[in-house]
Amino acid sequence: MIRQRTLKNTIRATGVGLHSGEKVYLTLKPAPVDTGIIFRRTDLDPMVEIRACAENVGETMLSTTLVKDGVRVATVEHLLSAMAGLGIDNCFVELSAAEVPIMDGSAGPFVFLLQSAGISEQEAAKRFIRIKREVTVEEGDKKATFLPFEGFKVSFGIDFDHPVFKGRAQTATVDFSSTSFVKEVSRARTFGFMRDIEKLRAMNLALGGSVDNAIVVDDYKILNEDGLRYDDEFVKHKVLDAIGDLYLLGNSLIGEFRGIKSGHDLNNKLLRKLRAEEDAWEVVTFDDEATAPISYMKPVLAAG
């Protein structure tokens, strides 16, 4: 059967918060079957636990932020994207601050950490959410949709009227039966416009942001010396963000997500709408890996 997964070992890392600019200590720990992904604010006494689920999303202005009883954990989407890509069901994420460290602005460092910790298959079937019919949310020219699909596919379209985006792909479709999340998506970095960053800093936000952890664009060009990691890195990062946001369903998806100019807010509204429409989805498990529409890297290979 396809089994639930957790980490073999505890692993630690240090980084800075994108918005706070503060140093953050991150610890990823194995968790029992059916735990889910649980964030822990270990800097608080008593420690506060916040489950990674759509209902706990409290803010979506610049990142996806989980909130419980006034306690926040911001910028969870890149770490959750890595968890989704590697099929990690159960994990404790301990943080010394109110924000997940930004690392290099992609999910790549989190993939490396998870693979370094090792992946352990557990004695319980992995539960998937299978989309049974279309569910859509729209706001103006933004749209987010779930569709039935035997596998997992993410399509995204962005539309920036800016010299850097001219002639670059602003759409991407990734079918994960034939495309590696680790190779093709996980390394895409977040991006920001210099003019926006200046405004954010005036509001005490993006204080940790730099060319070390984002693609920074001025009015004409990319400021990062090494350029882009993928030709379509901008839209690929939106795919990465969406995968992280969708993992707040609490299970891996069997279905297709299509986003047009969608962001964290609309993604979350789509999750809540899906949850409310119980005839639009079902929970499934697979006794036989060979017949399943989704497969994951073998835990041994995941360390490669």
UniProtKB/Swiss-Prot annotation:
The active site is at H264. The keyword DNA repair does not apply. GO terms for biological process: lipid A biosynthetic process. InterPro entries: Ribosomal_Su5_D2-typ_SF, UDP-acyl_GlcNac_deAcase, UDP-acyl_GlcNac_deAcase_C, UDP-acyl_N-AcGlcN_deAcase_N. Its cofactor is Zn(2+). SUPFAM superfamilies: Ribosomal protein S5 domain 2-like. Zn(2+) binds at H78, H237, D241. Keywords: Hydrolase, Lipid A biosynthesis, Lipid biosynthesis, Lipid metabolism, Metal-binding, Zinc. Gene3D superfamilies: lpxc deacetylase, domain 1 (3.30.230.20), lpxc deacetylase, domain 2 (3.30.1700.10). GO terms for molecular function: metal ion binding; UDP-3-O-acyl-N-acetylglucosamine deacetylase activity. Its EC number is 3.5.1.108. Belongs to the LpxC family. PANTHER family: UDP-3-O-ACYL-N-ACETYLGLUCOSAMINE DEACETYLASE 1, MITOCHONDRIAL-RELATED. This is UDP-3-O-acyl-N-acetylglucosamine deacetylase. It comes from Marinobacter nauticus (strain ATCC 700491 / DSM 11845 / VT8) (Marinobacter aquaeolei). The gene is lpxC.
